[in-house]
């Protein structure tokens, strides 16, 4: 791979939910302005891992996180860290589209407003337009900005959620199975969008679709039972994996 800049680095990351350990000594490097796909069976720790990156696990009382995650060499597993400031750097797109019960415009303007990015209406209009353009949605909704975001189709709602995520100008976008609730046509649009977004953002995508990982990512990490089994270029993982467990998973022998 040409890109050698590590954006996110996880070292000896362990996560417990009460007595249950969800992640075991996870070491994983995520490179800048690339798509890294995380694959593995359900319940193997993929979503837990990405929720550590934006500290969403903080809201779970029984969750205990140990180890290190750095973004641009800054430690984020730190109780004194400004979590709001961290989340300004990290956009999150969930499994099912979850637009706010607000207008299309307000869905996008909400993040920049709470983060204090601008109080100027003209500047906010520009943020909304640019975010929707980056999410390949502007032409479909530019005359409907005052309509409810929940009135859009499923695929449009997910692109609205992507526009909402990038409206605060993040450095990283986390996607937790963003196409699992979408039809093939809507999925193709999201995948085209991911390919375009990686020019500006570091993207981590959790997916159960092997073919999707091949199509959209430059690197792939395989999780199993809370451990990172193998991580390499996507081409190497799918054409010549170095671990038999990886080979068995991608060929459908277990999962």
From Swiss-Prot:
Stored Gene3D superfamilies: P-loop containing nucleotide triphosphate hydrolases
Subcellular location: Cell inner membrane
This protein's record includes keyword Disulfide bond: no
Reaction catalysis annotation: phosphate(out) + ATP + H2O = ADP + 2 phosphate(in) + H(+)
Gene Ontology molecular function terms on file: ATP binding; ATP hydrolysis activity; ATPase-coupled phosphate ion transmembrane transporter activity
Main localization category: membrane
Binding site for ATP: 40-47
Membrane topology: Peripheral membrane protein
Domain of life: Bacteria
A Pfam cross-reference name: ABC_tran
GO BP: phosphate ion transmembrane transport
Transmembrane helix recorded as keyword: no
The EC number(s) this enzyme carries: 7.3.2.1
Known function: Part of the ABC transporter complex PstSACB involved in phosphate import. Responsible for energy coupling to the transport system.
Entry protein name: Phosphate import ATP-binding protein PstB
Lineage, uppermost ranks: Bacteria, Pseudomonadati, Pseudomonadota, Alphaproteobacteria, Candidatus Pelagibacterales
């Amino acid at each position: 791979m040409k890109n050698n800049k590590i954006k996110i680095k996880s070292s000896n990351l362990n996560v417990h939910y009460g007595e249950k350990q969800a992640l075991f000594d996870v070491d994983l490097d995520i490179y800048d302005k690339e798509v890294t796909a995380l694959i593995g069976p359900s319940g193997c720790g993929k979503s837990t891992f990405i929720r550590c990156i934006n500290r969403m696990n903080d809201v779970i009382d029984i969750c205990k996180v140990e180890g290190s995650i750095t973004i641009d060499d800054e430690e984020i597993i730190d109780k004194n860290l400004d979590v709001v400031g961290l989340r300004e750097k990290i956009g999150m797109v969930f499994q099912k589209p979850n637009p706010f019960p607000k207008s299309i415009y307000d869905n996008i303007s909400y993040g920049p407003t709470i983060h204090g990015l601008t109080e100027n209406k003209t500047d906010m209009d520009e943020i909304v337009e640019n975010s929707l353009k980056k999410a390949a949605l502007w032409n479909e909704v530019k005359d409907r900005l005052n309509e409810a975001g929940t009135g859009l189709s499923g695929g449009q709602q997910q692109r609205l959620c992507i526009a909402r995520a990038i409206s605060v100008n993040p450095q990283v976008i986390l996607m937790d199975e963003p196409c699992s609730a979408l039809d093939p046509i809507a999925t193709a649009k999201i995948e085209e969008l991911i390919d375009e977004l990686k020019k500006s953002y570091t993207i981590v995508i959790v997916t159960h679709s092997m073919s999707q990982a091949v199509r959209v990512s430059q690197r792939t990490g395989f999780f199993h039972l809370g451990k990172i089994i193998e991580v390499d270029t996507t081409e190497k993982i799918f054409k010549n994996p170095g671990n038999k467990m990886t080979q068995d998973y991608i060929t459908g022998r277990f999962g």
